[in-house]
Design a protein with these regions (language model features):
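Glycine-rich helix-loop-beta junction characteristic of Rossmann-like nucleotide cofactor-binding loops
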Residues: 30-36, 101-102, 140-141
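Conserved class I S-adenosyl-L-methionine
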Residues: 37-47
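Glycine-centered, small-residue-biased loops immediately flanking beta-strands
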Residues: 39, 63, 146
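Mobile active-site "lid"/loop adjacent to the S-adenosyl-L-methionine
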Residues: 85-88, 103-145, 156
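Class I S-adenosyl-L-methionine
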Residues: 152-195
């Protein structure tokens, strides 16, 4: 739920982004240049579409963004967004994602969050499991040398998961964008150079 006094909420409304999360991706991309013109991008857990909007703007009309979520996401202006409604862990949904892209992904984005219970240890464990599912998806559909960006909730399970990521990527960094709420336990893991 958005806090109406939140400056990023207000900025998103003013600038036409579907969520304040758009600024997290904008900031990460400005610093790390993970998105480029013509790229093929998957946005896992894309609802409501803020990250897909940003990715679509950067990759341009020669690129493609394939968004997947269990919640219906409205079309995004620009014509380079394809939405697939469903659970990305299911084989038939994965097949739709792959055939929609037509080639391996250059970048896989995931700002996905589990349904939060308010029990920090449980929510963090569910976050790690979701991230493991995204990593497994990336193992199959991300091109060699590609980039994976994941949101995760900090906790005791993260260290072990970082080791898993380092087995699959040349470089793994933890990021906390300034647009992320200070009180939030979320961080982003940027994984570059898929092995």
């Amino acid at each position: 739920m958005y806090i109406r006094k939140d400056p990023f909420y207000k900025k998103a409304k003013r600038e036409g982004y579907r969520s304040r999360a758009a600024y997290k991706l904008i900031e990460i991309n400005e610093k790390h240049r993970i998105l480029k013109n013509g790229y093929c991008v998957a946005d896992i857990g894309c609802f409501p579409g803020g990250w897909a909007q940003v990715a679509g703007e950067v990759i341009g009309e020669k690129g493609i963004v394939v968004g997947v979520d269990v919640k219906k996401t409205q079309p995004i202006a620009g014509g380079n967004f394809i939405f697939i409604e469903g659970d990305f862990t299911l084989p038939d949904v994965r097949q739709k994602i792959s055939s929609s892209a037509g080639r391996p992904f250059d970048v896989i984005l995931s700002d996905i969050s589990p349904d939060l219970s308010g029990i920090k240890i449980r929510d963090q464990a569910l976050s790690v499991e979701l991230c493991r599912s995204v990593l497994e998806f990336a193992g199959e559909f991300l091109k060699n040398g590609g980039t994976l960006l994941l949101k995760i909730f900090q906790g005791s399970d993260v260290k072990g998961f970082l080791d898993e990521l380092r087995n699959s990527f040349k470089d793994v960094k933890i990021l906390k964008p300034s647009s992320s709420r200070k009180e939030s336990g979320e961080v982003y893991i940027l994984c570059s150079g898929k092995k």
